[in-house]
C-alpha cells in the first residue's frame, strides 16, 4: 500500500512513523506519520478485514433432450438446471451483521443477446442478490433455476457455458469510507457444457467431403456473366457443429442467391462478409451437420469487370466447422476460363428495292440530264452486338459499275458514317455530276408515256419481241466492278457504322437491251484483326452480306383500234335486235294485264 502525502511538497512526510497503537479501539493497530516540515502528523486508521468465501455449484452437463421445466409466460418445455450460490465471511473483530451484494452472470463470455442459458423466472442472463450474514457469519446459500435455450436459437454448442458469481460490499454514502475491507475469494466461476451426440468420448470428429463444378463458362469480357456453382456437400463422420460452406469470390464476382436440394430447406441462409480483403459467402449447412448428411447446393454468381482478370478466375470452396478435431474439408478450387468475344453484324439494304422502267426508256442522249435514271442507294450497316470491343475492322464493298457509259449504274458518291474511312477504286463520279440536282423518281422517267385510259392496253410493237426476258444478274462476276475499302480503328459494344453508296441508273445502257430485266447485286465482306484484351478471343468476327435491286421493264401501252370499238358497238346492237324480235315472236308485247281497282268500280 502506498500512502500519499496530504501536505505540501517539502514537508518531509514520513520522516517519523509510529505504529502498534489502536487509536479507535477496533482491534486493529493504526499508524501515525510525522511531517516535521509541516509541523503536523497524519493518522491512518486500520479497518477490519472481512475474508469472504464464495462457492458456485452447477451440474457438469446440460442435455437439450431432457426438458423438465416450462417457461412461466409461454408454458414452453425447456431443459433446466439448478444454480447454487453460497457465501460466507470470517475475520477479526468484524461487525455482527454483515451485508454483501452478490452478482450472478450466466454464459458471461457471450454477448448479452447471444447467451445460451437464462434464468427461468426472469429470462434474463444475470441477477443481483443482497445477502445478510448472521452473527456467526456462517455461510448462507441461495438456489435459483436456469434453462437452456432452444437448439434453434443456439449457434455455439461446443464451447463451455461459463457462470460467474461476484460478491462486493454495498455502496456507501458519498464521502464516507467503508466500515470494513472485503478480502478473499470475492469472485468465482464455474462452467457447464451442452451434451453432444459424439460417442463415449464426447468429442465429435467429422469427415466433411466437398465436390464442385461450374456451368456458364467461359466468362466473356464485357458481358453480364452469370455462373452456376454446383456443389455437393457431405459429412461421413460424426456431427459437424456450426458447419458452413465458404465460397471465396474473385474480383468482380457478386453473390446472387443459393438453393439446396433438401426438401423444405431449399432456400439457404447465406451471408457475405470480408476475410483478408476477400469477399466470402458463408452458407449454413446445419448445427450440427449430422452424420451421413448430403446437401446439394446451386449458387448463382454474377461476374463482371474482367478486363484485367487474366485468362481465368478462381473460386475457392471449403466446408468449415467449429469442431476441435478434423474441422474442415479439403479446399476445392474452381478455375473458370476468361475469353473475349464480339458479335458484329453486317446488314445490307437497297432503296428502292425495285425499279420499273419502260421498254423504250433509255433512248436519251448521253451526258444529258435525261440520261440520269432513278437514284439507287445501297446501304451497308455494321453493328457490334458485343459483348467486347473490336479493333481493326475492315469492310470491303464490291459494286457492279465503274462510272462508265457502258455501265448500268453510274456511281456518284460514297457516304460513310460512324467513324468509317472509305476509299473507292476507281474514283467515283468522274463526270463531276452535281448529284444535288432533282432526280427522277423510281417510277418511269416520263409519266406521260404511261398515261392510260379505259381504251388502252399493253401491246408490243410489231417489230419488237412480245415477251420480256427473264431477269439477268448483274454483279462483279459479270460486269466491271467498283471496290470500296473501309476501315474502322475501334468499334465498341453497341456502336454502329454505315456506308451508303449513291448511284444513278444510266439510261443509255438500258436502251441497248430494251426488253432485258436485271438484278443489280452488290456484295460486302468484313473482318476484324483483333480484340483489345489480354485474353484469347473465342473467334474473330467476320461476315458478308448482299444487296439486290430489281430492275423491271414495262412494255409501252398502245391505244385500242377504232374498228375494234365499232365492231363491239354493232355487235351489241345486233344482239339487242335479236332479243326484241324473239320477245315479239312469243307475244310478250300482246299479253293481257290484270284489271285495276278503278276498272272494277266503273263496271259496277
UniProtKB/Swiss-Prot annotation:
GO terms assigned for molecular function: integrin binding; metal ion binding
SMART domains attached to this UniProt entry: Int_alpha
Lineage of the species this protein comes from: Eukaryota, Metazoa, Chordata, Craniata, Vertebrata
Record-given protein name: Integrin alpha-IIb
Motif GFFKR motif: where in chain: 587-591
Membrane-spanning residues: 559-584
Record topology, Extracellular segments: 1-558
Annotated gene: ITGA2B
Binding site for Ca(2+): 22, 24, 26, 28, 30
PANTHER family recorded: INTEGRIN ALPHA (PTHR23220), INTEGRIN ALPHA-IIB (PTHR23220:SF73)
Cystine pairs: 69-80, 86-141, 198-204, 270-283, 422-486, 476-481
Origin species: Papio cynocephalus (Yellow baboon)
Compartments (UniProt record): Membrane
Cytoplasmic side: 585-604
Biological process, per Gene Ontology: angiogenesis; cell adhesion mediated by integrin; cell-cell adhesion; cell-matrix adhesion; integrin-mediated signaling pathway
Subunit structure: Heterodimer of an alpha and a beta subunit. The alpha subunit is composed of a heavy and a light chain linked by a disulfide bond. Alpha-IIb associates with beta-3. Directly interacts with RNF181. Interacts (via C-terminus cytoplasmic tail region) with CIB1; the interaction is direct and calcium-dependent. Interacts (via C-terminus cytoplasmic tail region) with CIB2, CIB3 and CIB4; the interactions are stabilized/increased in a calcium and magnesium-dependent manner.
